[in-house]
Amino acid sequence: MLLWFLSLVCSGFFLVQRMSAHVGSHDKPFLSAWPSYVVPLGQNVTLTCDSHRGSNIFKLYKEEGSPNHQLHETTFQKSQVFGPVTTEHAGTYRCFHPQYANVLSAHSEPLKIIISGIYMKPFLLILQSPLVDTGGNVTLECHSENMFDTYILISHRMGIIKNSVQVSAEHHESGSHVTYSIGPMTPDLVGTYTCYGANSYYPYEWSDSSDPIDIKITGVYKKPSLSALMGPVLMMSGETMALSCISDHQFDTFHMSREGVPRGQGMPAVQSHSGKFEAKFLLSPMIQKGNYRCYGSFRNASHVWSSPSDPLYLPAKGNCPAYTEADTKTNNYKNLHILTGLLVTMVLVVIIIFYSCYFSKQNKSQKQAAASMEQEYEVKNTINTQNFEGQERQEVTYTELEQRIFNQNLMPPISRISEFSADTIVYMEIMK
């Protein structure tokens, strides 16, 4: 009888344990935070505990972090708003539903609440283009002047945190940093990335968020075509140029890039009369030269792009011709002919300037020589006049013929003038 009673008690005990385990695992609630479990200092966060039983009453308790006296022996209705949050709200939380006296539901999985904005934000850099081919890799670097122990890289999609990676930091004289390699690239890895810094002794207190970087994957869909609008349909405003991106695919949005870097926001696609989908991009008057490409994407996957269009080269700002790679060789020949013509013109101009300077100097030299000869003539005339002052007055006739120097002295030397003082002296000097 005693053995039968003990056997019945043990069976009942194990049956209750098994039923409790079954009920607890089936009724395990789910604890979530909105808008995110990473909460900026001073902002609000809403904690919600959901259950398959549809119960709206639950309790919270904190496993790690500073004690939160607001939770002690307090029952909440479905959701609870905390805020403005401080470092006291940081920690690990669980929730459960009180069912009846001394019987509780299973506890939820732990939920970490992180308070950000405790330290200055780090800087996030991308070491390649943010447009990554399918299967490619990309490297991100997060660095700061603060000596953080760890950095946390977080990816967002539609404003919701998808993944996070925590890596130990490397220290150096100017601060700390860490590098992340992402790839091979798939649509699941793309999104908006930010990074935070933290210290091991305060794991629930992070720095402010870095500036975001958007990483897109390309090559998922067929490439569109890109062209410059020419002729009467050219959409111009001053020196603004219009580019057209067109595709057979029913893309929602088209995007533009220059030298692998996205430019501005995407443009909505419009279906043309031919049934194709098109978007027009107006480039500012100060057009930067380079290779332009366009891509297509869908609204529900804005980080997943098509293959790039063939490059369209814009060589200069303003109203400039546009070239594709097929036109490059032809344009190079044209440019070579233009350059050759300019060089020949420059050489001719230099030669003309040289000869002009040469003849100018020659004329100047001739004028100086003529002036010098005229001055010499005046000096000689003065000397001859003075030599005859002591003699009898004689008649001297000067004749100037053209510009050749020719002296004909019909008078005797000066020493013999006195002997022929009665004769007429004819002096003829022809100067050039």
Swiss-Prot record:
Gene Ontology terms: cellular component: plasma membrane
What SUPFAM superfamilies does this protein's entry cite?
A: Immunoglobulin (SSF48726)
Signal peptide annotation = 1-21
Glycosylation positions?
44, 137, 300
Q: What is the lineage of its organism?
A: Eukaryota, Metazoa, Chordata, Craniata, Vertebrata
| Protein name per UniProt | Killer cell immunoglobulin-like receptor 3DL1
Q: How does it sit in the membrane?
A: Single-pass type I membrane protein
What organism is the protein native to?
Mus musculus
One Pfam family matching this protein: ig
